[in-house]
Amino acid sequence: MLDIGVIGRLKFATAFMAMSLLLVPAAEAQEQPVWHYGLSLVDDLKYPPGFKKFDYVNPEAPKGGDLRLSQTGTFDTFNPLLVKGETAVGLDFVFDTLMKPSEDEISTAYGLLAEGVSFPDDISSATFRLRQEAKWADGKPVTPEDVVFSFDKAKELNPLYQSYYRHVVKAEKTGDRDVTFHFDDKNNHELPHILGQIRIVPKHWWEGTGPDGKPRDISRTTLEPVMGSGPYRIASFAPGGTIRYERRPDYWGVALNVNVGQNNFDSITYSFFGDRDVEFEAFRSGNTDYWRENQAMRWATAFDFPAVKDGRVKREEIPNPFRATAVMQAMVPNMRRKPFDDERVRQALNYALDFEELNRTIFYNQYQRVNSFFFATELASSGLPEGKELKNLNEVKDLVPPEVFTTPYSNPVGGTPQKARENLRKAIELLNKAGFELNGNRMVNTETGKPFSFEIMLSSPSFERVALPYAQNLKRIGIEARVRTVDPSQYTNRKRAFDYDVTWEVWGQSLSPGNEQADYWGSAAATRQGSRNYAGISDPGVDALIERVIFAKDRETLVAATKALDRVLLAHNYVIPLYYKLAAQIAYWDALARPKELPKYGLGFPEVWWSKSAACHLPAGVRCSCICGSSGEAGRHQFTPDRRLIRNAQLLDQICAASEFKG
C-alpha cells in the first residue's frame, strides 16, 4: 500500500476479504454481482453490516471550535491531482474518496462515496456503486462521470498515479451510479483496494469557468479555492502563508457510520513556516495547538516552558509501535551519478556513519538504527531466509546477490574510538577496491586523480545536526561532503528531477505493501521524474520480487515475498540507513480533547479529536483549557486565543455554570 498523505492508507485483497452481500439474496449469488460494504486484506471485517460507528470515536463529540496547525514549507496550488507545484496540505478535508479506512484494523476500509464494490473471482475488474445521496458542495450529485474523469486525469497528469494505477487500463460508466475499472492482469489482489483511495473531483466544476471568466484547466496549478464533496471547504488563504478550512454545515455525509464522531472542528487553519525551529516557537507561544516532535534534543530539552509545567500543554509519548512503523529513513546516494553506482562506495559511506555516537551525543539514546526497509514489522527480514521466503529467493537465484542466502544484513556498529577507527579503515578498504586511494589527506580516483567530493542536499536545517558530524567523519577518510540546506520549493523540484548527489529521504510503508513498491524501487521508476525511486534502483531481481509482492495471493505469501524483497534491497546497500523511534511524540494545548482510547493503528488526529471550547459552549473567541466543573483553580483556567489566562473566578463560574458539558 502507498503510504503518502495525499493518497491515504488503504489496502484490499480478496484472499482474506470478509464481505457482505448488500443487494442480492443467496439464491441469486451465482448470477448477480456480490456487493461488499467493506474490504479487508488481513482478516474478517471487524464491523458488521449496518454498523453505527467506529469504536475509537466519541459519537457525542461536540462540534465547534477552531484548530490551529502548522506546516513546514509552502504551497502554490489547490489542484489535488498534479505533481507540479507545491500542493496545499489539508485537501483531504475537501475531497472524499470512494472508500474510507478504519484505523483500528489493518488494511481495511468501508464505503464512503461508494456504497459497495463488486468484482469477479479472477479480479479482472472492479465496479463501485456510488451512494445516491453523495453530493458536491454545490448540491449536484457525485456521478460515475466524475469518477472516470478523476481517474483519467490523475493518470494523465501525475507520474505517481501513472505508476500506482498502471495495471488499471480503463474506467467507464456502467450504470446510473456504477463505474467499472478494467485491469490488464488478473488476480492482482490489491487493485480493488487502491482504487478506493482516489480523490474524486467534480468534472463539471473543472470544465466550467473560473471567477475571471476563463475556462479552468486541471492540467495547471491554481489558487482558486477548489470545490469538493468532503466535510470542509477552503474558506480563506494567504498564498504560501496560511489556509483556513471551514466545516460545511451542508456536508452530505455527516451522518454516515464512517463519519460519526469525526470532523468536529468548525475550522482548521494551517500556518506555514520555512524553518522547523520557528514552527516550534509558534506552538510554544500558543499560536498553534498541536505538535508532533521528530527531534530528540527538542523533545528532551525544549518542553520546560511554563505552559507545560502548569498543565496547559500536555506532552505524551504513545509507545504503540503500530503508530510509527515500517519506515526506512536514510541518506540516499543517487546511483544515476558516479561513483554512487558502485556498491562498494555506498557500503563505504555506511561505514563512515557512527550512529551509536550520534545516538549518545545528540539523540539522548532515544533512537534505534533502522535495519530494514520494513523496519519493526513482521515484513522485515532477519537471520537467514527460510520457508517461503527462501523459496522466493531460490526462484530468482540468478538475479540476486549470493550473500542473501548466507549472510544476514547488519549495519556497522560504532560508539567508541576504537570501533570508529575500525569502521573507517573498512571504508577505506572498500574505496580502494572501487578505484580510489588516499593522496595526502584527500581521497582521489586512481585513474583521473579527481577528489571524491559530493553534496548532501537537505530540506531542513534540523537535519544538519546529523549531516555535519557525518561530513566530518567522511573528511577523516579524505572525502569532502558539502552539506547544503535548500528552500522547500527547490528541494521538491530537485528531488523530482533527481538533481542531487546524496539526499535525505523517509519511505513510509503500510503493513500491506503492493503497487507502490514499483514506484519506490522498480526499474521503470528509476528514469521517471516524479517517482520516489530516489536511489535510482534498476535491478531485475528487485523487479521480480516486487511482482511477487504485488500478486501475492494471501497474507502468508505476501509476508514471505516482502521479506525476500527487503533482504535483496539491503544486500545491495542502496541507502545509508539512519534511525527511528517506535513511538509517537505529541504535545498539544489542552484546548484540545480526544477519546480516551486512540485507534489501534493511528492517532486519529485531527479527525476524532475535538475542541473543549465547543464542549463548554464558550462565547466566541474564548478557548477552554479545562474540563468545566473540575475542582481547583488550576482546573478552571480558561484562555483567549492569545493564551492570556482568564483568572477571574466569577467569570469562570458563570461560563461553566452556563455550560451543558460537565467533565
Swiss-Prot record:
Gene3D superfamilies: Dipeptide-binding Protein, Domain 3, Periplasmic binding protein-like II. One of its GO terms (molecular function) is peptide transmembrane transporter activity. Keywords: Periplasm, Plasmid, Signal, Transport. GO terms for biological process: microcin transport; peptide transport. It is found in: Periplasm. Residues 1-29 form the signal peptide. GO terms for cellular component: ATP-binding cassette (ABC) transporter complex; outer membrane-bounded periplasmic space. InterPro entries: Peptide/Ni-bd (IPR030678), SBP_5 (IPR039424), SBP_5_dom (IPR000914). Pfam families: SBP_bac_5 (PF00496). SUPFAM superfamilies: Periplasmic binding protein-like II. Possible binding-protein with either a transport or enzymatic activity. Belongs to the bacterial solute-binding protein 5 family. This is Uncharacterized protein y4wM. It comes from Sinorhizobium fredii (strain NBRC 101917 / NGR234). The lineage of its organism: Bacteria, Pseudomonadati, Pseudomonadota, Alphaproteobacteria, Hyphomicrobiales.
